[in-house]
Amino acid sequence: MFSSITFIGSSVVVVLLAGYWAQKYLPPPKPKIVGIDLGTTFSCVSVYYAGSGRVEVIPDDKGRKTVPSIVAVKSKSQRLVGYDALEYSDHDPSRVLFDAKRFIGLHFNEEAFNKEKRRYPFRMWLNQTEAVYHVANNNETNDANKELNIRPEEISATVLMHLKKMAQKHLQVRRVEKAVISVPAEFDEVRRNATIQAAALAGLEVMRLISEPTAAALAYGLHQKANVSSVIIYDLGGGTLDVSVLMIMGGMFLTRAIAGKSILN
């Protein structure tokens, strides 16, 4: 009886020691959720390592940590993203689509749309109240459809897919399937749902949409500062300016007011 108890006790000690050494010396588990800033002009993807508390912004093959939110549609089956699309704009700017974030989930009347589309080198048309990109199809497959109509969600999805592949390669995992994505505070339910739809097209499940001012406040640890109760967040992006007033209560952020300009020119 005594020997059995001794054996069991020794086994427990061995298991505990093995767990300790494994936790101390084995590499930490790979992050399963990425954070994405899907910007108007630039986007980036990052991961949080729970063991160390470290946040890493994932670079591309050339070490760049931001990706232009641009897609060049060479044909129905071939698209370029980011810096490759930016280079292609010198060749054919009418095929290089951008500013999808301005249009995603947004509805226009004809007058407002006609004023907006004049700002761009590519073609767009109004499908009822939704802005749609319009690109000639390079007919490499003799497709009867000579024109390509591309929704803003599809362009955002292409950028998200590019970021997803960057994360998979950097983390050396087969699949990244979950993400937290930041969106402007002024995005209503329709525009938020359109962003979720774009993520789904890229094969990403959105665990949460977080407002960009809240994301900035969290990044600076303002929720952990006892002497901070209110804060103004200025978000000066590549083509937009947003200002938000946040209240901090019990570690939570409450948006009290928002203002901004979606087109800086």
Q: Where are the predicted features?
A:
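Conserved thiamine diphosphate
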Residues: 119
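Oxyanion-binding/catalytic loops of NTP- or PPi-dependent enzymes
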Residues: 2-115, 123-126, 141-145, 149, ...
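Short, solvent-exposed beta-strand/turn patches at coil↔beta or beta↔helix junctions
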Residues: 130
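Short loop/turn segments at strand-loop or loop-helix junctions that form parts
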Residues: 136-138
